[in-house]
């Protein structure tokens, strides 16, 4: 099956009414919160997805009845074995779609996350399996985040929050969290400065914002942008 056929089949199977699956979206969000070191709470889902508090509470209650998660005594959301398996599957499809969109179709780096949010809900298991073959040796998504199930990353995916690394000197941008991925305009600004995973960066705090500088091989600043401290918490870096 050619890559064009994979794309055609995926789109043919997509029903517009099924492009967004709320349960899958919530499961993936909980998994992403865990990945970013954020305690999964209903309030955090409100922040991430922009849904109202009552809507999130109703959806979470339904998911608990369906055996996908538990609401713990401290309000933390804990995925059940079934819920985690489903969440992992959705996240893997999302990140495979991102790689296909960027590496094969040639979509702009700043736009592939938003587009993949639609694809993750309509990709069949057969298409997923074929993409895994066609995109072999792909263990991270375009934003440096791990591909679920990639054994090559076992024990190697550690990075530090950018806000904990202020004034730490020259660093390497390791990965970019979902809240920044969801901002297409901000991602485009990152791209213009070459601020992709693997780039050399310098960080400094200025009040309630963080300056993220793009550095050349000599450590000279090529350009920079400023982002709110809250967003900087979703940049992950490594020391050189």
Model regions: which residues?
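Short, intrinsically disordered or compositionally biased N-terminal tails of bacterial proteins
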Residues: 1-16
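Mid-protein regulatory/catalytic core that forms ligand/cofactor-binding pockets
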Residues: 7-10, 120-231
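Short acidic, hydrophobic short linear motifs in intrinsically disordered regions
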Residues: 36-46
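Key DNA-contact positions within bacterial/archaeal DNA-binding proteins
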Residues: 54
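Short, hydrophobic-biased segments on the C-terminal half of alpha helices
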Residues: 60-61
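A short, conserved structural fragment
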Residues: 64-72
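Basic, amphipathic "hinge/linker" alpha-helix immediately C-terminal to the N-terminal HTH DNA-binding motif
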Residues: 75-94
């Amino acid at each position: 099956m050619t890559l064009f056929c994979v794309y055609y089949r995926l789109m043919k199977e997509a029903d517009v009414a099924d492009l967004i699956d709320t349960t899958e979206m919530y499961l993936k969000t909980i998994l992403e919160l865990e990945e970013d070191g954020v305690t999964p709470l209903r309030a955090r889902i409100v922040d991430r997805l922009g849904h109202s508090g009552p809507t999130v509470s109703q959806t979470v209650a339904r998911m608990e009845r369906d055996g996908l998660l538990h609401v713990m005594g401290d309000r933390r959301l804990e995925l059940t074995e079934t819920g985690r398996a489903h969440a992992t599957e959705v996240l893997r499809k999302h990140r495979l779609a991102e790689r296909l969109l960027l590496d094969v179709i040639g979509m702009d780096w700043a736009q592939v996350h938003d587009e993949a949010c639609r694809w993750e809900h309509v990709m069949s298991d057969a298409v997923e399996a074929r993409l895994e073959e066609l995109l072999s040796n792909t263990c991270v998504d375009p934003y440096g985040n791990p591909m679920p199930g990639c054994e090559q990353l076992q024990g190697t995916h550690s990075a530090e929050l950018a806000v904990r690394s202020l004034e730490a000197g020259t660093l390497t941008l390791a990965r970019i969290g979902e809240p920044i991925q969801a901002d297409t305009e901000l991602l485009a600004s990152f791209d213009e400065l070459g601020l992709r995973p693997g780039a050399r960066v310098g960080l400094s705090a200025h009040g309630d914002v963080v300056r993220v500088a793009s550095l050349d091989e000599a450590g000279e600043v090529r350009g920079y942008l400023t982002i709110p401290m809250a967003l900087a918490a979703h940049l992950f870096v490594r020391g050189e």
